[in-house]
């Protein structure tokens, strides 16, 4: 059994949707603890939801992760249960929102498309799959039901692509995307802590190029490794390479938005 469910969505907290999903889970599995990771994700923002879910798996790998940012709900896309090599379980729509979290969990080991009839739902599905399919599936998983009971296996190569791709090596640099901007204006880049170490980016100074902006800055352990107003590169609490400004906004200073292409290289 899994004792913790991490719940990420773009539902907000004013309309009762989060509470309804909680109630569905508790009704079938009263012993589970549901942790609300984030529900103030901008509506339909699959990229942001994917980033938050990936951080959740990195910090709580042994939990079940329910992730819902689903602009295509009711439109025929699949509902999924994914199991990572590290043992994390992810439940959500097949729109790419789950994939970055699987990278943080060591990759996909098993994937299943949820058959709503196998979890007891027989009415026509419409606009609230989180209540009608995903939350009931999470409750069954938390109760110890094996993932094979939910539907047919899925070839991971057929899943909808992630909203951003992991960084990759290009000659003497790492090329990646800006994942998102945190509320302090720090710029998260799709380069994991492991990739930073493997590519020698955790020593000395770095060059970071955001297309229009070229920055030289130190790689540090924390924001206060530099003076107030100075930039620093570090691994943030979500486990991503991040460009920050001590007591300032890197996003405002460098005019960078999510999705921007980045190149990072170590300076001699």
Region spans (language model):
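Fold-independent oxyanion-binding glycine-rich loops
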Residues: 9-11, 37-39, 68-71, 84-85, ...
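Anionic-ligand-binding alpha/beta catalytic cores of soluble enzymes and soluble regulatory domains
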Residues: 121-202
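Active-site histidine-anchored catalytic micro-motif
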Residues: 28-33, 48, 59-69, 74-132
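A conserved acidic, glycine/proline-rich C-terminal tail/linker
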Residues: 190-255
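Conserved active-site and cofactor/substrate-binding residues in soluble primary-metabolism enzymes
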Residues: 16, 20, 29, 44, ...
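Surface-exposed interaction regions enriched in Ser/Thr/Asp/Glu
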Residues: 260-266
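Structural motif
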Residues: 3-6, 32-35, 63-66, 79-81, ...
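N-terminal glycine-/serine-/threonine-rich phosphate-binding loop
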Residues: 1-76
